[in-house]
Swiss-Prot record:
It comes from the Bacteria. It holds the Pfam family FMN_dh. It comes from Bartonella henselae (strain ATCC 49882 / DSM 28221 / CCUG 30454 / Houston 1). Substrate binds at Y24, Y129, R164, R278. GO terms for cellular component: plasma membrane. It is found in: Cell inner membrane. It catalyses: (S)-lactate + A = pyruvate + AH2. It is an enzyme of class 1 (oxidoreductase). This is L-lactate dehydrogenase. Signal peptide: none annotated. Catalyzes the conversion of L-lactate to pyruvate. Is coupled to the respiratory chain.
Length: 383
């Protein structure tokens, strides 16, 4: 199969993965309207082509906090990444580090912090949910800091899990889910051998380390669901800001008022995110929400964005709308499932090449030159 885009990697991943895993990463909440709008609204944002601008060389690097990135891209935290390829978090982290961008390890990863640190050193970020079990939160913060992690992505848009109807149909949850997953593995022998057998253990590495017992896939939804805390408020989180001495990014901001409160909280950055359309269906796409948030807090916070990004053109669009850098989640998992570490590295190269072409044809030489002037229709969502 010829692979030349994220969409090609998605097709390859669908063929290789058991349905319960493919639809877990591919699906959204409820009717998936927000998930579809994330992508569609980005495509509706036209770039402004300029000619004869003398763009001899394009610089894709950018400064983010105290890091210089080769690209304004970060691999987003994705739970259970290690179920998509053998020790998937390690493979994705290696690809990211080789390409000069950060990898963000999910707190509900298969590979624990120590395993990723052994593979790539301290060159990764760590993500954490707000959970009732404060002991677990403190434990993983201490272990990530001891491993050299200095950037924490704190997910704040998941006080309760979204209703993901696809999961019940695919076998991730619902009646006879365990049996259905076993049957699916039998008809996907490559995955069954390479990941199902050779990729063990399949527990939640960070949780198992804390509890000193294995938390397998069957227990994943129950453990996580029992630990979400919808009663949480800003004041309840102050201990985390006081405890964590590195950079802290709040992930899940969709409203300018919440972005302003993030400043008061002491955040160093935010991720404008609707969780890839996997939480509350019917909310704004991130590319629509981004300009108002950027206008409100751009001078005070580093702004990242995710959801719907499938190409380097989309990265340029998001930066033009006010982002400093972009996180990609589904896209890299498709590539990981299809071709492992090499697939993720190739995908990052595809994004880089697409960005170079887009920047050349819009007449900009560096990331800092991408502005609303790079768009032909910056006000398309206001019409």
């Amino acid at each position: 199969m010829i692979i030349s885009s994220t969409l090609d990697y998605r097709k390859a991943a669908k063929r290789r993965l058991p349905p319960f895993l493919f639809h877990y990463i591919d699906g959204g909440a409820y009717a998936e309207e927000t998930m579809r709008r994330n992508y569609a609204d980005l495509q509706a944002l036209a770039l402004r082509q300029r000619i004869l601008r003398g763009v001899g060389e394009v610089d894709l690097s950018t400064k983010l906090f105290d890091q210089t990135l080769d690209l304004p891209i970060i691999l987003a935290p994705v739970g259970l990444t290690g179920m998509y390829a053998r020790r998937g978090e390690v493979q994705a982290a290696r690809a990211a580090v080789a390409k000069g961008i950060p990898f963000t390890l999910s707190s509900v990863s298969v590979c624990p912090i120590a395993e990723v640190q052994k593979a790539v050193g301290s060159a990764f970020w760590f993500q954490l949910y707000v959970l009732k079990d404060r002991g677990f939160m403190r434990d993983v913060l201490e272990r990530s800091w001891a491993s050299g992690v200095r950037t924490l992505v704190f997910t704040v848009d998941m006080p309760v899990p979204g209703a993901r109807y696809r999961d019940a149909h695919s076998g991730m949850s619902g009646s006879y889910a365990g049996l259905r997953r076993i049957l699916q593995a039998f008809i996907h022998p490559h995955w069954a051998w390479n990941v199902g057998i050779m990729g063990r253990p399949h527990d939640l590495g960070n949780v198992s380390t804390y509890l000193q017992k294995k938390i397998a896939l069957d227990d994943y939804i129950g453990w996580l669901g029992a630990n979400f805390d919808p009663s949480i408020g800003w004041h309840d989180l102050q201990w985390i800001r006081d405890f964590w001495k590195g950079k802290m990014i709040l992930k899940g901001i969709l409203d300018p008022e919440d972005a302003r409160e993030a400043i008061q909280f002491g955040a160093d950055g935010i991720v404008v995110s609707n969780h890839g359309g996997r939480q509350l269906d019917g909310v704004l796409s991130t590319v629509r929400a981004l300009p108002a948030i950027a206008e409100a807090v751009k001078s005070d916070l580093t702004i990242l964005v995710d959801s719907g990004v499938r190409s380097g053109l989309d990265v340029v669009r998001m930066i033009a709308q006010g982002a400093d850098a972009v996180m990609i989640g589904r896209a890299f998992v498709y590539a990981l499932a299809a071709a492992g570490e090499k697939g993720v590295a190739h995908l990052i190269d595809l994004f880089a090449n697409e960005m170079r072409v887009a920047m050349t044809l819009t007449g900009v030489r560096a990331i800092k030159e991408i502005t609303r002037e790079s768009l032909a229709s910056p006000d398309v969502f206001e019409q």
